Amino acid sequence: ASSVADARAMIAAMPPGKTLAINWPLRWVKSHVTAKRLVDEGLIGEVIEIHSYGGNRGPLYHLADKIEVSREEVERQKPTSWWYKRASGGGSLLDYLGYGATLGTWYRNGEAPLEVTCVTDETPGIEVDQHAIVVCRYATGLSKMETRWGTFTDPWMIQPQPKCGFVLVGTEGTIASWDYADNVTVQTRAKPEPHPIPADPLPPRGRNAIEYVLGCIARNEPLTGPLDPATSLTGQRIVDTAAESARQKRTLPLMP
């Protein structure tokens, strides 16, 4: 959705007996699914911090057929490109914060933050942000969600530094789950040295949104996780509050 109001309207429009699903492609990344399993199994205790970093080199690098564009040409196009227009909903925050906010809500079993603070870059001649840092205050402490148009490399090709993905901090350990990785890296009280755990293969009928939704319908089960409208609504509330926080340059309570 483009706003909390639109998200609530979508939920209200869902006919009785029908299913509304919101697809997040990162939900089908096996490392992130494995991280959720380990959290649910209690490996790291209660999740008390989430750090996410999401982005890419920038939208103008990704033309049809993945035609490569030079950095000089990208910079030349930025001031006039619709990607970089506020009225078009441009910017790294609106592009990527939904992933960190929604999957972060999933990892926290639906818990919402109390307050949100967001700071964005302000590049002369560019209407929208290319870098946003969002701090969410939860009852258990702070979490950080960062978005970037301008990573050194695209994470689906070569993971940049900082790496794109999630670090989950729990009362009994930590999990680092990077986008598109074949394993997660774990610390626990029993084994504090960071060590890899192989990512689980995605199960049959759970490899993508269509398989998952059809399976839930066939089993008469509700959707869970990021595809659940309630989880995505919390993510949207974080996004909208962050955008308004950046505009007002102050901390705000989470939007209802």
Describe the residue ranges of each PLM region.
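ADP-ribose/adenylate-binding Rossmann-like module
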Residues: 1-3
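C-terminal helix-rich "cap/oligomerization" subdomain common to oxidoreductases
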Residues: 6-12, 19, 127, 212-256
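Alpha-helical structural signal in soluble globular domains
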Residues: 6-16, 38-41, 137
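A short helix->loop->beta-strand "cap" motif at the edges of active sites that frequently abuts
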Residues: 16-18, 141-142
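Predominantly a Rossmann-like dinucleotide-binding segment in NAD(P)-dependent oxidoreductases
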Residues: 18-21, 26-124, 249
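Contiguous beta-strand/loop segments that form the cofactor/metal-binding neighborhood of enzyme cores
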Residues: 69, 95-183, 200, 207-222, ...
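A short glycine-threonine-serine/GTX helix/turn-capping micro-motif
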Residues: 87-94, 195-204
